Amino acid sequence: MARQHPIQDYRNFGIMAHIDAGKTTTTERILYYTGKNHKIGETHEGAATMDWMAQEQERGITITSAATTAFWNGKRLNIIDTPGHVDFTIEVERSLRVLDGAVCVLDSNQGVEPQTETVWRQGDKYHVPRIVFCNKMDKTGADFFKCLSDIVDRLGAKPVAIQLPIGAENNFKGMIDLVRMKALVWNNESAGAMYDVEEIPADLADKAKEYREKLVEAAVELDDDAMAAYLDGKEPEEATLKTLIRKAVISGAFYPVLCGTAFKNKGVQPLLDAVVDYLPSPLDVPAIKGVDANGNEVLRHADDKEPMSLLAFKIMDDPFVGTITFCRIYSGILQSGTGVINSTREKRERIGRMLLMHANNREDIKEAYAGDIVALAGLKEARTGDTLCDPENPVILEKMEFPDPVIEIAIEPKSKADQEKLGVALAKLAAEDPSFRVTTDHESGQTILKGMGELHLDIKVDILRRTYKVDANIGAPQVAFREKITKPAEVDYTHKKQTGGTGQFARVKFQVEPAEPGAGFQFESKIVGGAVPKEYIPGVEKGLNSVLTSGVVAGFPVVDVKVTLIDGAFHDVDSSALAFEIASRAAFRDALQKGKSVLLEPIMKVEVVTPEDYTGSVIGDLNSRRGQIQGQDMRGNANVINAMVPLMNMFGYVNNLRSMSQGRATFTMQFDHYAEAPANVSAEVQKKFA
């Protein structure tokens, strides 16, 4: 079957926004007007087509990006719905990674909100061309012009209005199209399906003229011929102006701004027209870079004739189909039944069912082409960020980078049956979401869940309970302390048990000293003349190792210590490996006491990105958490603060930072080193654990 839609008619785009800006409602309306949805799903009734997980329908926020295919004016739209909550930014990152363009939705009442800044920065990182839709123009306090100034002040970007609102709040009737210089006015009877194209109202004529001039001036800057014609007094024709706006969007020179109210069905069709007219096709964006089998950089162009390559950007567990892997095909043609290689993991796979997804419905297809976004059922090895490609032409496409988790909790299943279900469920959840990690604490034997924030882990626990029917207790977050000696110590210890029958005898003399940070445990025997026979040395080491797991301060593992066996004695009959193990254990514990053992705590490297206004509060708060500020610098129009902070003082920080900065600051943290805990902290921990 040949390709039905030329690749230049594809628009792979996402809708990005702050939580509650009306992103899912906008997507719903797009699906409605492109004829994919017969009944509009309202988010606040918990029934939106894109928000199909039970957790999303209850909370009314979008958690999983669902991919949907629709058509408008003969163009094929692949829409990815992205979440707007800070704990789900990983979802936004991986969506932006495979998109060619995006619509940024703003709440006209709120303007640019905190999460808008975060997703905008991610869009900048991946150079995603964007248009802006000022939604909720019918809301009290809606202000289109404040949105324009916010984009300049808070995003450091250049907005250019291509529409102006007619009326606002309850009187919002439609918009002036500055490209065509016509008024688009909706009649309320047709659920927004019909609107009239009229002359611009007289009271708005001057404003329309002023903003039309701004638009034309910004557009002609991109083309010398158009600029020369404009300076000669020639206005660009509509087709020329659209070409120039498209050029601006693709190059990032400026961002066209539209307005409307998705909920009241006004302005969605012109938004779709703008997606088709101004957002790039796969041919308009740079070819994706990759690395071939020899480590050389290669390019894969959006072309059916090139070797097949695709990137897995999302894994989902579907109750009917099993594991579904969402992929963007960057080059070549993919057919069901073909063998592919997962070049990231060097594993071979066979393509079984291939599906086009529409929110929660699916359509089986046999063939997909460069530029398509498809769902593959039944892949065993693929993980998010993996490359699948033609075995004859292996390539690894640009990898996605995922942040390390910043919060962890312990989970304990309530019964044996839950224990078995938990293992399977956690493996699936970790495969679906690279920012969610599962580890086992070797010291406590507990299963530890790590994630991007408290809401992130709440939702994972909720999925465990609902989808996988696992009942479990959730613990409070914990810190992994360590212990270390601070000065050298020498001990001479004799273990003697000789009361008739086979006795026990062993004498050991150790020199114990602190080792370099990160050196771990080092053991050396300097025995000469057979004072301790060779066959007993393993017993000595076993005794020492048994103490390492539980030190003398508060029972935490001992690190960075060197033990030298310098002398000893044995008995021909009563000595054994066990006797030397017991002697070594007691001697080592004595040495740890004599060597003034201290408690070590993990220190985290913390980076906070905050608007200038909150810098003082953020630094003050980090200082109150025993943080040491390492430096500050500017990134765009945000301030970046680097600090070293003890992990035990970082619990709950994500929520504190959010409220301190009205959600506008973000942070990342990773383990850096262990450092001696202050006496008061050590005393508190000893009281709790020892």
UniProtKB/Swiss-Prot annotation:
Q: Which residues form the tr-type G domain?
A: 8-283
Subcellular location(s): the record lists: Cytoplasm
Signal sequence span is: none
The protein's matches in InterPro entries, at most eight in alphabetical order, are given as: EFG_II, EFG_III, EFG_III/V, EFG_IV, EFG_V, EFG_V-like, EFTu-like_2, G_TR_CS
What Pfam families does the entry give?
Answer: EFG_C, EFG_III, EFG_IV, GTP_EFTU, GTP_EFTU_D2
Listed under GO cellular component are: cytoplasm
One Gene Ontology MF term: GTP binding
Q: Which UniProt keywords apply?
A: Cytoplasm, Elongation factor, GTP-binding, Nucleotide-binding, Protein biosynthesis
Q: Which SUPFAM superfamilies match?
A: EF-G C-terminal domain-like, P-loop containing nucleoside triphosphate hydrolases, Ribosomal protein S5 domain 2-like, Translation proteins
Report the SMART domains cross-referenced here: EFG_C, EFG_IV
For the ligand (GTP), the binding residues are: 17-24, 81-85, 135-138
The reply on keyword Protein biosynthesis is yes
**Gene3D superfamilies assigned:** 3.30.230.10, 3.30.70.240, Elongation Factor G (Translational Gtpase), domain 3, P-loop containing nucleotide triphosphate hydrolases, Translation factors
- UniProt-listed GO biological process terms: ribosome disassembly
Matching CDD domains, A to Z?
Answer: EF-G (cd01886), EFG_III (cd16262), EFG_mtEFG1_IV (cd01434), EFG_mtEFG_C (cd03713), EFG_mtEFG_II (cd04088)
- Role according to the record: Catalyzes the GTP-dependent ribosomal translocation step during translation elongation. During this step, the ribosome changes from the pre-translocational (PRE) to the post-translocational (POST) state as the newly formed A-site-bound peptidyl-tRNA and P-site-bound deacylated tRNA move to the P and E sites, respectively. Catalyzes the coordinated movement of the two tRNA molecules, the mRNA and conformational changes in the ribosome.
Q: Which family does it belong to?
A: Belongs to the TRAFAC class translation factor GTPase superfamily. Classic translation factor GTPase family. EF-G/EF-2 subfamily.
Designated name of the protein: Elongation factor G
Q: Species lineage, top-down?
A: Bacteria, Pseudomonadati, Pseudomonadota, Alphaproteobacteria, Hyphomicrobiales
